[in-house]
């Protein structure tokens, strides 16, 4: 579910390149996304309309028959002195047209790559966030089928074998180098991997997660090098449709629980602030047994708010999440208040702690859009 808005943002930026749309559109990206997504025709693209068989590692790689796709990693790391970090590395692929261009110019490719890289330095109370955007060009940006890889210059997400991953991103003195190994099974979200976002036919995605991957590697900040280890979360999603016009945004939660379980839930919000009936998620217990969650299975209560000094947007901060079917009554708190992306598109995405009955119960990531 994470970062659907960022995939839509690619439409705005790429159409500026291809069709010389005035740059003032990105001053109001919420409106621009709606307008320009409509201009980018769905015709010729595959749609997520029914269940499918997932095959790994093939499905870790790109699905160019669909308009949008992303590889999303977040995680929590500690160095040898127990200094904590949170990270996000997400690479998006977006197709502007189903038919390949006949232009002789390589710059007229319909494939666009967008990257978001963030590091939350918890002890230093600093959120580092960077964005990159490029058309798919040889040696610059693109995807590979075998072994699976997606890259944007030197930002790379790639498989080193059928199970393991390597992540690399560096910018302005902030660097992430990680090797990841799965520590949990793949979770197919929604209806065996078909995640419906509304009642409209085809307004859905194929969506799976790997809620727990063991991570080790290095974090570099300016002149300091930190050998780190921890755990990561992978979300993979591809689709052709966007959200419906009635849906203003979402609150997305991905929690790695201390007992070995995991919880993912996204609350789709209407423009009047109400919850959409297509809000959904899943809970996996310590044995790996999965429970599919519907909108009325989860209760979410915001504990407070935080106003961004960058965008003046007001976000909820701190949550109580109740899942009676899983016997969960959790409290979430941001590890840093300011984990807002305030570049071309503003949203809040950051590391959180999880407690239950006053005791530490895990770590997670939260994404908030449409505020």
Where are these regions (language model features)?
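Structured soluble/peripheral alpha/beta segments that form catalytic or ligand/cofactor-binding pockets
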Residues: 1-371
